[in-house]
From Swiss-Prot:
Domain of life: Bacteria
Family: Belongs to the thioester dehydratase family. FabZ subfamily.
Lipid metabolism found in the keyword field: yes
Primary location: cytoplasm
Annotated catalysed reactions: a (3R)-hydroxyacyl-[ACP] = a (2E)-enoyl-[ACP] + H2O
Keywords: Cytoplasm, Lipid A biosynthesis, Lipid biosynthesis, Lipid metabolism, Lyase
GO CC terms, sorted: cytoplasm; membrane
Gene3D superfamilies: Hotdog Thioesterase (3.10.129.10)
Active site: H49
UniProt EC number: 4.2.1.59
Subcellular localization, as worded in the UniProt entry: Cytoplasm
Name assigned to this protein: 3-hydroxyacyl-[acyl-carrier-protein] dehydratase FabZ
Any one Gene Ontology molecular-function term assigned to this protein's record: (3R)-hydroxyacyl-[acyl-carrier-protein] dehydratase activity
């Protein structure tokens, strides 16, 4: 039985199809959350990744983990309608096995450090009890009215440009 269903998740996260990557929340504590994503062949990334061997891109697995973390951060906030959880860092990401259509991706995230508006979380993603990915993500709580911070401009010397 789900603690949060898709409609409750949609009330918490701003993501929408095709980028809402959490279908249900199964467990939630103060510093830990478990969510699932049912991976289906109808998702747009499988058109090109890869046509003859559809595999969920690793970055989308990490995004699903980060969205699960975002539910934990935003769930108990009274003014969450005015907040966003921005992914600001990914560390120690490892992809162990491919995730394919028909899989149920289970994401478990735990807060390992929290300071003011920033939370660092460690997580694993599994399919049928087998670890398929792991990563640490850092999320920043921001007001929706704030413009997201831009990446610093990188200056490439003219002679190094391709």
């Amino acid at each position: 039985m789900a603690i949060l269903d898709i409609n409750e998740i949609r009330a918490i996260l701003p993501h929408r199809y095709p980028f809402l990557l959490v279908d249900r929340i199964l467990e939630m504590e103060t510093d830990r959350i478990v969510g699932i994503k049912n991976v289906t062949f109808n998702e747009p990334q499988f058109t090109g990744h890869f046509p003859d061997f559809p595999v969920m891109p690793g970055v989308m697995i990490v995004e699903a983990m980060a969205q699960t973390a975002g539910v934990l951060v935003l769930h108990s906030m009274p003014d969450r309608a005015n907040k966003l959880v921005l992914l600001v860092a990914i560390e120690n990401a490892r992809f162990r096995k491919p995730v394919v259509p028909g899989d149920t991706l289970r994401m478990e995230m735990k807060i390992i450090k929290r300071k003011a508006s920033v939370a660092k979380m460690a997580g694993i993603a599994t399919v049928d009890g087998v670890v398929v990915a792991e990563a640490e993500v850092m999320c920043k709580l921001a007001d929706k009215e704030e413009k997201p911070p831009a990446a610093p401009e990188i200056k490439v010397p003219a002679e190094a440009a391709v």
